[in-house]
């Protein structure tokens, strides 16, 4: 991928929910919930403090995270849908 977020921003590839239920019922796109889990694919360098020092982000590429339903901005790079948001919009890392 050729996208590098700036400062305290991260790029997340959403993890889509299943197309079918366990019982075999197909879920149409119109009723699917917006994904709230994803994998981090790019991170910014960090945020500057008052002294001008850059503090790196806690999150790293490959982390699976949980974020708010309406967090971030959706973009598309080379056919891949991503969500760009601030690190502080992430609730936590999924183990």
Curated annotation (Swiss-Prot):
GO biological process, one term: chaperone cofactor-dependent protein refolding
Pfam families: Cpn10 (PF00166)
One GO cellular component term noted in the UniProt record for this chain: cytoplasm
InterPro entries with a match to the protein in the record: Chaperonin_GroES, Chaperonin_GroES_sf, Chaprnonin_Cpn10_CS, GroES-like_sf
Coiled coil: none
Top-level taxon of the source organism: Bacteria
Molecular functions (GO terms): ATP binding; metal ion binding; protein folding chaperone; protein-folding chaperone binding; unfolded protein binding
Keywords: Chaperone, Cytoplasm
Keyword Cytoplasm set for record: yes
CDD domains: cpn10
Role this protein plays: Together with the chaperonin GroEL, plays an essential role in assisting protein folding. The GroEL-GroES system forms a nano-cage that allows encapsulation of the non-native substrate proteins and provides a physical environment optimized to promote and accelerate protein folding. GroES binds to the apical surface of the GroEL ring, thereby capping the opening of the GroEL channel.
Assigned protein family: Belongs to the GroES chaperonin family.
Known partners and oligomeric status: Heptamer of 7 subunits arranged in a ring. Interacts with the chaperonin GroEL.
HAMAP family: CH10
NCBIfam families: PRK00364.1-2 (NF001527), PRK00364.1-5 (NF001529), PRK00364.2-2 (NF001531), PRK00364.2-4 (NF001533)
Official protein name in the record: Co-chaperonin GroES
Organism encoding this protein: Rickettsia peacockii (strain Rustic)
Lineage: Bacteria, Pseudomonadati, Pseudomonadota, Alphaproteobacteria, Rickettsiales
Designated gene of the protein: groES
